[in-house]
């Protein structure tokens, strides 16, 4: 869902001169690095996986975002740590977009360091530095702090938008996000 709203957020940033900061959230942190099929992830919850994928594809098309036929979910912890590192560079937003595309379009496993390094390079950031960031887990504590912050805010789903002391949960329409920032 975070990927779905990237275009909306970009339009708001341009229109209002916003600065956006990401707080990472532990969505399915129990997912093994090898991943889970979507059928395994949603087993026993009564979801029609094909219907879910078709709906997501339609929503992505409306937003003019590429979207693949994703069959698995993967542990995103290392990707979050890499994203946190990327925040200190102008290319950080590009890194986030490339991570979303690798996952939602290409179906790549973001728990695999080589995938993350390829994505880093595609975002024009240093592959060598990123390798150290991943190997040494240099942003583990920063992501742990994000997870605590999300928990303290009562976040239970993604994306969650916070502006001032108000928040919205879910892939909200542009107009709802605009109202959130105008109510500041």
Explain the meaning of each model-derived region.
Residues 3-106:
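Structural alpha/beta surface segment adjacent to cysteine/selenocysteine redox centers
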Residues 1-18, 22, 84-184:
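C-terminal cap of thioredoxin/glutaredoxin-like
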């Amino acid at each position: 869902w975070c990927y779905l709203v990237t275009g909306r957020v970009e339009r708001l940033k341009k229109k209002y001169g916003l600065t956006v900061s990401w707080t990472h959230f532990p969505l399915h942190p129990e997912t093994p690095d090898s991943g889970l099929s979507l059928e395994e992830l949603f087993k026993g919850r009564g979801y029609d996986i094909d219907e879910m994928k078709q709906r997501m594809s339609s929503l992505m098309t409306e937003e003019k975002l590429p979207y693949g036929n994703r069959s698995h979910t993967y542990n995103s912890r290392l990707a979050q740590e890499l994203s946190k590192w990327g925040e200190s560079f102008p290319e950080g937003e590009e890194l986030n977009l490339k991570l979303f595309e690798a996952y939602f379009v290409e179906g790549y496993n973001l728990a695999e360091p080589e995938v993350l390094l390829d994505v880093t390079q595609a975002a024009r950031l240093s592959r060598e530095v990123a390798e150290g960031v991943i190997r040494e887990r240099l942003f583990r504590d920063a992501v742990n702090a994000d997870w605590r912050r999300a928990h303290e805010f009562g976040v239970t789903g993604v994306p969650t938008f916070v502006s001032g002391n108000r928040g919205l949960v879910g892939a909200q329409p542009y107009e709802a996000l605009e109202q959130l920032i105008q109510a500041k």
